[in-house]
Amino acid sequence: MTEYDYEELGLVAGLEIHQQLDTATKLFCDCPTTIREPEESDRSFTRYLHPTKSELGEIDEAALEESMVDREFEYLAYDTTCLVEEDDEPPHRVDREAMETTLEIAQLLDMSVADQVNIMRKIVVDGSNTTGFQRSMLVANDGAIETSAGPVGVEDMLLEEESCQRIEETEDGVRFSLDRLGIPLVEIGTKPDISSPEQAREAAERIGMLLRSTGKVKRGLGTIRQDVNVSIEEGARIELKGVQSLDDIDDLVRNEVRRQVELLDIAEELAERGATVGEPQDVTEVFEDTDSGVIEGALSSGGKVQGLLLSGFDGLVGREIQPDRRLGTELSDHAKRHGAGGIFHTDELPAYGVTEAEVEALRDAVGAGSEDAVAIVADDPETAELAIDAVAERAETALAGVPEETRDANEDATSRYLRPLPGAARMYPETDVPPVEPDVTEVETPELLTEKVDRYESEFDLGSGLAEQVAYGQRWPLFEALVAGEGVDPTLAAGTLESTLTELRRDDVPVENLTDKHLQGAILLVDGGDVPREGMEDLLTALAENPSLTAEEAVEQEGLGGVDESEVRDAVAEVVERHEDQVAEEGMGAFSALMGECMGALRGKADGDTVSDVLRSEIQKRA
């Protein structure tokens, strides 16, 4: 990956971190914050959404473009959702637990809390909210975090309702699920103080650590999302949305910088060529006898082929601007936003069943010369016209350089066009929910995870790796209850909650069935000597596969209770006698091979030290 002098390019970046809060109920109703499977839905309904004007009488550009795509939105409802999510009942008051957690986060970020929190409506007509807007409130501003490259300011923090979960595209539009709608969500926006890809990742990791330090945020895929705003001096501000993994942030910034540098180079070359963008025209006749499956499929359904002359663009439409993405990919993204499957262009033709003769005929039809390129869209007449107009508009912006826009992060740390940047015209006041006056007097600042790691090392004598696993994991409250409250050996508790559960998960044991009560019971039995340490995996496996059992019942069912030394000696002697020739020949050299067999014979009913001592004794008798 190309590395640039980011200071010379004038790289400026900022973050927006969206984190779901782990509250009992949703932000504006009493429904649980439980994620459901689509198959569990007991009813559904459909909506069409349209943008409304802001309080200043303006319509947001991003919302307007979204509304131009005519789509039906279907919503799956459940027995854990209500009329508030369906927009058939007014919202209730702001959830108290969500506000208290938000105030804790504000303290960790050293932010100033607003005297009065007013709820606003943010226009969103992509179907992700049944109302056509998202409720949002500014709770705090003006904070800061530290990074190795210097401080990064925190501009603001908002408490919002999470959007619907997108399930799938349908023939008429999009299917959404209401289970996620309304889960409390904090949005933390930094100031544009970030000047390198590495600092962007470090800042995101720092904020993520602070959020998890509260112990009141949801964990797992989709519960935290990062948006990254990136610009370079001669480029434009780009909002990169939906980054799921912190590991991708630095590469995403690098790839966006490369994209802007390449687009600026293309714009410079287009200017030198005197490039222009022509008017779309119907070129269906060129492809009447085509062997291209895509084009023939469109025409056989009554479709058309629209062409666009890109004067001076030859060789540039196919130029790579990000890994495996080209200027032509950018044009195609805009066509796709209007329902087309994509575009073909002459930098990649002949291909896809389009012949050399058809390419020449296409060039003749639009009057293209040797330095020109041609883009085409094949689809139903209306879609083809909308899509080719969008391609022409994006090609025009290529003449100027880098357009401001919102882009969607891809899994490979590249990005694709999503919509124009939203503006202030998307906000207006919420009239159904009264303002909130936050009370910060009783808010306690939680212990940071980094501080917790240090404490576990010093207080419980855990190694740094294990201490970090426990502190950053989800079971640290149980760990502390066992060690501080029950006097359990810290290494046993930590090793079980982290290492043992990880090993069982890799062996496809359903550890998600294990509750804190299961784990506490198992650890107490082992710590008390009722079950040998070697029996822990078998005990937890039994509980995971039969979660209705208690730890004591699982021990009895699996026969995991400890055995006395005479039973150990009998089992070990039997193993040694089966291998008497090997013992006679190798002596103590046979120890390792026989130890595993002895432990297997005892099925975790005796600890390893006892078995080891007895085995050594039995070998020495016979050697």
From Swiss-Prot:
SMART domains: GatB_Yqey. InterPro entries: Asn/Gln-tRNA_amidoTrfase_suB/E, Asn/Gln-tRNA_Trfase_suB/E_cat, Asn/Gln_amidotransferase, Asn/Gln_tRNA_amidoTrase-B-like, GAD-like_sf, GAD_dom, GatB_C_1, GatB_Yqey_C_2. Pfam families: GAD, GatB_N, GatB_Yqey. GO terms for molecular function: aminoacyl-tRNA ligase activity; ATP binding; glutaminyl-tRNA synthase (glutamine-hydrolyzing) activity. PROSITE patterns: GATB. It comes from the Archaea. Its EC number is 6.3.5.-. One of its GO terms (cellular component) is cytoplasm. Disulfide bonds: none annotated. It is an enzyme of class 6 (ligase). Keywords: ATP-binding, Ligase, Nucleotide-binding, Protein biosynthesis. Gene3D superfamilies: 1.10.10.410, GAD-like domain, GatB domain, N-terminal subdomain. The keyword Protein biosynthesis applies. Heterodimer of GatD and GatE. Belongs to the GatB/GatE family. GatE subfamily. Allows the formation of correctly charged Gln-tRNA(Gln) through the transamidation of misacylated Glu-tRNA(Gln) in organisms which lack glutaminyl-tRNA synthetase. The reaction takes place in the presence of glutamine and ATP through an activated gamma-phospho-Glu-tRNA(Gln). The GatDE system is specific for glutamate and does not act on aspartate. HAMAP family: GatE. This is Glutamyl-tRNA(Gln) amidotransferase subunit E.
